[in-house]
């Protein structure tokens, strides 16, 4: 429309019609959408039927031209509630934090000209009797710190460990643009009400081949989604580390399982004859002396196709090798990925 092409954003629930955008006090859902055209801005749309239909609102929530950094990369808004007010993180280029009392009119709280990312996210976790905040940089890297008022402005302050470095959030080659989902606001520092926070990533990458996948494999869409992951924090030697665990609901998808306890050798392939398009393998290895690598060949085919999942005992590294995994999109796609 006149505001530009619509890109990514997020949805928040206005339970009390604080925005005055809805026809009743029951409120509804507000979508915050990037509009790209002569710079970027955040526009609004609303739904009063739980997301089945949407109506654009003639209102710009925030515009790059009004931002102190004057940077046209002003996209990927993520909205959350904390301490009785609404917050929005925006980036695409440098990170900004905005706040609002009514979900419609927003003011800048703090800017981070040297911290660039797409798809920013900011959410809390309770650990060691306190609330810590995780800043996601596109789902690839993260920082842990505090969201607090500094000189009257809400500011993300990273922990000392994360001031000049990031934690690695996802080692997967095809994992980007993470988004989190949850069912309520986060409460207050005095009374936090932090729900389970679930993360979902785009299973593709801008690094090399994302725009080649659909054509090579005959799809009409660009990528798919990774597993849903439950977010957590863990204190490791005084440093808070992000944890990501597949949600418990995946266990409901389990079919009949098979258990093996055996010594693996050249003549007793435990998975020989096993067929399936998706499966879960839970394993424990007790390597014999001199063993250097253990792992699995999965999705094997009669034409030599296979995907290798290998743990290297000497390097203490796990490796995914898909150089023979069917259609090869590009050289980058075929590269071995280790962590």
Regions found by a protein language model. Name each.
Residues 1-23, 51-81, 90, 106-124, ...:
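Surface loop/turn signatures of beta-propeller and other carbohydrate-active proteins
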Residues 18-32, 85-87, 129-134, 192-199:
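Entry beta-strands of beta-propeller and related beta-repeat scaffolds
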Residues 35-39, 140-141, 206-207:
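Short glycine/acidic-enriched loop and turn motifs that connect beta-strands
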Residues 45-48, 97-100:
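Conserved Ser/Thr-centered positions that define the repeating blades of beta-propeller domains
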Residues 121, 126-144:
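Loop/turn-rich, solvent-exposed surfaces of beta-rich toroidal or solenoidal domains
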Residues 149-151, 159-165, 169-173, 184-339:
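Beta-rich accessory regions
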């Amino acid at each position: 429309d006149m505001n530009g092409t619509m890109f990514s954003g997020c949805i928040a629930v206005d339970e009390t019609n604080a925005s005055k955008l809805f026809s009743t006090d029951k409120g509804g859902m507000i979508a915050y959408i990037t509009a790209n055209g002569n710079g970027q801005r955040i526009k609004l749309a609303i739904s009063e039927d739980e997301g089945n239909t949407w109506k654009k609102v003639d209102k710009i929530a925030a515009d790059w031209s009004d931002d102190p950094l004057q940077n046209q990369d002003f996209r990927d808004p993520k909205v959350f509630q904390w301490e009785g007010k609404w917050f929005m993180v925006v980036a695409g280029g440098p990170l900004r934090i905005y706040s609002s009392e009514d979900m419609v009119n927003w003011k800048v709280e703090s800017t981070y000209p040297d911290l660039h990312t797409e798809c920013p996210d900011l959410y809390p976790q309770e650990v060691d009797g306190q609330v810590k905040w995780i800043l996601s940089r596109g789902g690839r890297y993260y920082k842990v710190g505090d969201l607090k008022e500094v000189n009257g402005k809400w500011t993300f302050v990273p922990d000392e460990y994360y001031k000049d470095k990031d934690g690695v959030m996802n080692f997967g080659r095809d994992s980007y643009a993470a988004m989190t989902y949850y069912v309520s606001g986060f409460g207050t520092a005095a009374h936090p009400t932090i729900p389970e926070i679930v993360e979902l990533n785009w299973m593709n990458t801008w690094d090399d081949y994302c725009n080649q996948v659909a054509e090579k494999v005959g799809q009409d869409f660009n990528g798919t989604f990774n597993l849903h992951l439950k977010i957590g924090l863990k204190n490791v030697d005084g440093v808070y580390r992000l944890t990501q665990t597949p949600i418990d609901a995946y266990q409901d998808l389990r079919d009949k399982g098979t258990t093996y306890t055996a010594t693996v050798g050249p003549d007793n392939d435990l998975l020989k004859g096993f067929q399936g398009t998706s499966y879960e393998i839970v394993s424990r290895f007790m390597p014999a002396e001199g063993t250097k690598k253990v792992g699995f060949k999965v999705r094997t085919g009669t034409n030599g196709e296979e995907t290798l999942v290998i743990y290297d005992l000497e390097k203490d590294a796990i490796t995914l090798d898909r150089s023979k995994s069917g259609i090869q999109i590009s050289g980058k796609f075929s590269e071995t990925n280790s962590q």
